[in-house]
Amino acid sequence: MVSAMPRPLHEIMESGWAEALEPVADRIAQMGDFLRQEVAEGRTYLPAGENVLRAFQQPFDQVRVLLVGQDPYPTPGHAVGLSFSVSPEVRRLPGSLRNIFLEYTQDLGYPMPSSGDLTPWAERGVLLLNRVLTVTPRKPGSHRGKGWEAVTDQAIRALAARGKPLVAILWGRDARSLRPLMPDVPCVESAHPSPMSAHHGFFGSRPFSRANALLEQQGAEPMDWRLP
């Protein structure tokens, strides 16, 4: 096993997240060892480098919406460390993201975004969290069961325990299975936006306006979902 001295969490993520994830600091270090071993054995992983923990760079205390994905896009050049998001340079959007944008325009009446970059959502308090934070290129689900689930489960539990306004958007069976981690958090649930399931309950589900209504019921400001 290729091992290295783990960096303190406060050096690799926002301080509130470092405190929230301290109970799984050892697991995060183990996942670092796992990724180094993958590289040592000639395999790569997505997203690259610091983007693995990118979801935890925005302030923990400012998260108002949790949007759960499964694992990163396996297509090289797509995964950026935020669930469903891609870099601004990606012109042909993944099918799930295209469907998210179709529902966004129908739900909110906004024009189609100019790119698939969801960074503005993250900066406004949407935690774009994949349940599994890495993947082998072109092999969807390849890092499931390797240890990331313990990390992201702790992230969800910590958010739910803050006692601050929060809404979870759970698309698909995998995301809905996380409901027991946050029994008191209002949730917007539907089918997954994947092309295989979007017509079975995702389209027409109005997740963005429903999330805002649930935020307002908690006395919080609605989320500004507009994208450039």
From Swiss-Prot:
What domain of life is recorded for the organism?
Bacteria
Task: Please name the GO terms that the record assigns under molecular function.
Answer: uracil DNA N-glycosylase activity
A GO biological process held by the record: base-excision repair, AP site formation via deaminated base removal
Keywords of this entry:
Cytoplasm, DNA damage, DNA repair, Hydrolase
E.C. numbers: 3.2.2.27
Against PROSITE patterns, the record matches this protein to: U_DNA_GLYCOSYLASE (PS00130)
Q: Per its database record, what is this protein's job?
A: Excises uracil residues from the DNA which can arise as a result of misincorporation of dUMP residues by DNA polymerase or due to deamination of cytosine.
**Per its record, how is this protein called by name?**
Uracil-DNA glycosylase
What is the organism field in this record?
Answer: Thermobifida fusca (strain YX)
